[in-house]
């Protein structure tokens, strides 16, 4: 009873201190109305950790990313003057929870989980990847087997269709928002099966375990480059306009100086 009363009192006090938080969790405040969590007004609450923890969205096997990110992590360490540890997260929800609990300081969140990271974990997104010609983003693509009888989206009715995970944009949220206007309603016209990842969805289509799957174009492009499937075995049924890609963000409660150094590291590094 005492703990519950204390928790309620704390929440009430927090609510009284914060006049505006929009869709943010009760842990955070948004007095300036920019839709992301404000830094703590009490400077003693600001963090300046000796070791920074960085994670990247687990759209594919997390193990492949550590080597890919090592050169940037070295650069980040040099610019900030701190040790940097790569944290291989296993799911979108685990990544959001790690940031919310203070175990993560810098992260790349894929499109779907970004609003959850902002609202539930207090992330401040500051950048996405782009190309030198100003292009950015990826597409939701619906794949089926090359010899499939699925020719248009309405043909998905009654089929085995794999979504990736509930929080994924191209793997679940965008299909639920866009497919009804294309003639098919997920969970109504076909039963949704979650494969757990874009690469598992794609490999499942290739193997015939699924009749079709909505996936992120950037993931299947990388899979093809690595020889994980033969593009001749599959066919695109439909693709969307581009969505913003992975957002990079920092924890809201890092010191302003540290946030600036982290951003400097991202913007001064040659990712090409």
Where are these regions (language model features)?
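N-terminal hydrophobic or amphipathic helices and topogenic motifs
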Residues: 14-94
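Bilobed "Venus flytrap"/periplasmic-binding protein-like clamshell domains
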Residues: 54-77, 112, 135-203, 210-212, ...
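Short helix-initiation/N-cap motifs at beta->coil->alpha
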Residues: 86-97, 186-203, 242-244
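Ligand-binding "clamshell"
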Residues: 117-129, 223-237
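Acidic, polar ligand-binding/catalytic clefts
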Residues: 97-155
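C-terminal segment of classical bacterial N-terminal signal peptides
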Residues: 4-13
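Hydrophobic residues within well-ordered alpha-helices
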Residues: 99-100, 156, 205-206, 248
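Periplasmic-binding protein-like
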Residues: 57-58, 132-141, 228-266, 270
């Amino acid at each position: 009873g005492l703990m519950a009363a204390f928790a309620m009192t704390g929440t009430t006090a927090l609510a009284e201190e914060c006049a505006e938080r929009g869709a943010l969790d009760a842990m955070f405040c948004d007095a300036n109305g920019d839709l992301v969590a404000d830094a703590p007004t009490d400077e003693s609450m600001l963090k300046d950790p000796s070791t920074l923890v960085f994670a990247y969205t687990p759209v594919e096997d997390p193990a492949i990313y550590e080597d890919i990110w090592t050169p940037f992590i070295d650069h980040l360490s040099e610019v900030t003057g701190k040790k940097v540890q790569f944290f291989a997260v296993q799911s979108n929800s685990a990544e959001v929870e790690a940031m919310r609990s203070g175990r993560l300081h810098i992260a790349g969140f894929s499109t779907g989980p970004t609003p959850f990271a902002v609202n539930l974990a207090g992330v401040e997104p500051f950048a996405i990847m782009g190309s030198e010609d100003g292009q950015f983003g990826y597409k939701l693509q619906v794949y089926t087997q090359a010899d499939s009888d699925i020719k248009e989206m309405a043909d998905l009715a009654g089929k085995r269709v794999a979504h990736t995970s509930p929080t994924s944009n191209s793997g679940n949220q965008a299909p639920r928002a866009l497919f009804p206007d294309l003639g098919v309603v997920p969970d109504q016209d076909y039963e949704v099966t979650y494969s757990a990842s874009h690469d598992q969805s794609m490999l499942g289509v290739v193997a015939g375990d699924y009749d079709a799957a909505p996936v992120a174009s950037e993931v299947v492009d990388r899979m093809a480059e690595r020889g994980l499937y033969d593009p001749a075995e599959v066919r695109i049924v439909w693709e969307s306009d581009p969505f913003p890609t992975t957002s990079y963000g920092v924890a809201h409660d890092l010191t302003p100086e540290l946030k600036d150094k982290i951003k400097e590291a991202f913007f001064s590094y040659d990712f090409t």
